[in-house]
Amino acid sequence: MEETKTIKEKTIELIDALKATCQTYGMGNDGNEYKIITQVFLYKFLNDKFGYEVKKVSPVLKNAEKWELAYAEMSEDDHLDIFDSLPSDIPLLNPEHLIANLWNQQAKGDFDLIFDSTMTDIADKNIDIFSTQTAQNTKIPLFEKLTQYVTDDTARAPFARALVDKLVNFSFEEAFEKHYDFFADIFEYLIKDYNTAGGGKYAEYYTPHAIATIMARLLVGNATDLHSIECYDPSAGTGTLLMALAHKIGEDKCTIFAQDISQRSNKMLKLNLILNSLVSSLDHAIQGDTLIAPYHKSDNGQELRTFDYVVSNPPFKMDFSDTRERIAAMPVRFWAGVPKVPAKKKERMAIYTLFIQHVLNSLKSTGKGAIVVPTGFITAKSGVEKKILQHIVDEHIVYGCISMPSNVFANTGTNVSVLFFDNSRKTDKVVLIDASKLGEEYKDGNNQKRRLRDFE
């Protein structure tokens, strides 16, 4: 395990170095920093993944002292033969796309243009597989021009050189060879600075890894005969809930479907899917408003698609007065009603009640689901909340509820609970678990938080 630790430490050092570079060039905590960090890290990951895989299919490259040089000397036909032999979840890279090639061109004055064109060319070449899309079917490419975020034109080439300098110190190939499973932890570390409050409608409601794991374990249980499973999150954020579910089921046994209105979340979700060997699900990761324009539909395009497992950690309160009437015009979907627009404090509109209804509507007849809700929902005596409660209890859909510790979520001090649904409606009793006192307190900046320990 010492080797794993060494690679993991080097990976964390790489992330810290990339963040330091952004800081040096005036983009520390800038709104564009996350784009640079996530895309450059992903470029490094895919470059090394490509190198690892091409050496498995080409003896020439495997035995070469410098495989990048040997690859560059091959003919175009040889490259095409290699591409045909690669698994479908491996990106196709030309010699000029490799980190080694960029390293050798750093002395050129227009290196920022070379760097940017390399990134966009890789994205264009792999657009069919390595892209997500909007609800209007616009492809969202893998990479974009990154040096444009440096305001000073004269600093762009040095910035690009500084980024590439950080990418050549080690390779992920050893991690691939030994099947080390630490990229889920690396993703958590990579995005930890960007899961803060603010920034976007349905802002990035990050789910702590421990809670995601608990939800996945309780949903899937000890089921072993799982295959062709479809999992969905209508408020996916960065995908933590879906990744935990896929890991429990088996990444090779399930397909992920996701939607979130946030552009930032979609970029991070893309990275999360790739790091977790779920490239085939990228096409199902949609950026768009789930409530007014749900993307995932049945084959006839009229009804909502239904899934084996549905999970969600939606925003609880939010001003959606601009779209409220459009939502209310869909009474079949929102059968329990839609919260009214208050005269004051529109930001306190209970948008989570709409996501509960959407989750229930998205379950197969034998499907299971789980959703994070404010604990106050459980004792609601009126309004939309009461109608939903009455429905899930009377119809025997809800089978469990866990009250979580306060301050367990980074962005809210609201007490939260997790509801568990089983649409087969076989359960007569609801299991209530009080986990509010579990876990340990820790300091998160100026805030006192609580995190759960791993428990069954």
Predicted regions and their residues:
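Non-catalytic, mostly N-terminal accessory regions of nucleic-acid modification and defense proteins
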Residues: 1-214, 218-219, 281-290, 403-406, ...
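A conserved structural/catalytic subdomain of Rossmann-like adenosyl-cofactor enzymes
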Residues: 2-5, 304-456
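Helical mechanochemical/support elements of P-loop NTPase systems and associated helical scaffolds
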Residues: 10, 14, 29-33, 159, ...
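Glycine- and acidic
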Residues: 21-23, 172, 196-202, 251-256, ...
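Generic recognition of flexible, low-complexity loop/linker segments
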Residues: 23, 273, 292-300, 358-359, ...
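Flexible interhelical turns and helix-capping residues at alpha-helix boundaries
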Residues: 26-29, 223, 249, 363
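A generic secondary-structure signal for well-formed alpha-helical elements
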Residues: 44-50, 54, 194, 223, ...
